[in-house]
Amino acid sequence: MRRRPESSSTAPDTSAKKSSGTSKTDEEAKLNHGIQIRTARRSSFTWLTLFAVIVYSSWAVYQYQYENLPVPLTAEQAGKRGFSEVAAMKHVKALTELGPHTIGSDAIELALQYVLAELENIKKTAHWEVDVEVDLFHVTVGATRLDSGMFVDRTIIYSDLDHIVLRMLPKYAPEARENAILVSSHIDTVFSTSGYSDYFSLRKTSLCCFREGAGDCSSCVSVMLELARGISQWAHGFKNAVIFLFNTGEEEGLSGAHSFITQHPWSTTIRMAIDLEAMGIGGKSAIFQAGPHPLAVETFASVAKYPSGNIIFQDIFSSGVIKSATDFQVYREVAGLSGLDFVYADHGAVYHTKVSSVSLPLFTI
């Protein structure tokens, strides 16, 4: 008789396990039913706070770069060797009262006479250990052709230009004569720029020149006059010759800088060039072109109390997008010099116009 095989109690029951697993899954699904799983999201308050931090940080950087300016000094506060913004602004007043001084005008002759008289006075009052030479330089004829910028592939012929050149030499350093630093700006203006002024007001901490055309570039010339006066009193304060070039013809194709750098005998002694410019009527004077050697900009950054600059400006300027040029282009391309090009550009909308009646703040000087 055959016996029916009995199922072992130890044999695995797979069907039971499957049913058990299914029941557990169903139970977990029931437990999780109605529970929403959310991803982490930032609240609107967090985004608002982040935006406020970015705005405040940007404002702080702007304030530090462009609004952190020195307190203007009077001549008494600056002393013999210091720089007085109030004294410089007096030169702005005198030059802008002449009206537009374009090449060939009577006003440009008066402006040259004013600058020459101020330089002769600096020569008379200079420290006995500083040699001061003043040269009225006349250019008969010349021509320039630049490799880039708005004057690329254009030949510009110029004639009958007058410049004033000042050279300062420390008597105790004879080698300084062959190692000069050039500081340059232009006296001439465009014909559309008016020079009339209504008044000249003095305040406790600021002084504004409310005159039309105080920018390009009577303010630069005034800075150079005051800077030259201060340097003339430094007996042992400098080791290189300093040449100040007050040129004419910048508005006519950079002719003034080109004629000086190619024809004046002192130009061969220059090792670095600093150009002062204006493309507006206020703001902080900042570097917008430099190089090609980094020595000048590195030195400026290490010693300047209020350094400011933006290398992006140089790229934009060199691209030709902005149809303008400065004397620094001549010093860099023609003379092969390294250096710095300073500019202030607030209220650029009134640049080179007869309605440039926005006040020139004293701290811009």
Language-model features: locations:
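Intrinsically disordered, low-complexity regions
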Residues: 28, 32-34, 68, 80, ...
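Soluble extramembrane regions of membrane proteins in the secretory/endomembrane system
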Residues: 71-365
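Hydrophobic membrane-insertion alpha-helices, especially the h-region
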Residues: 46-60
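Intrinsic low-complexity, intrinsically disordered segments enriched in polar/basic residues
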Residues: 8, 15, 20, 41-42, ...
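Short, low-complexity, Lys/Arg-enriched N-terminal segments of secretory-pathway carbohydrate enzymes
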Residues: 1-35
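Aromatic-capped interface at the extracytoplasmic side
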Residues: 63-73
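Membrane-entry signal-anchor segments at the cytosolic-membrane interface
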Residues: 34-48
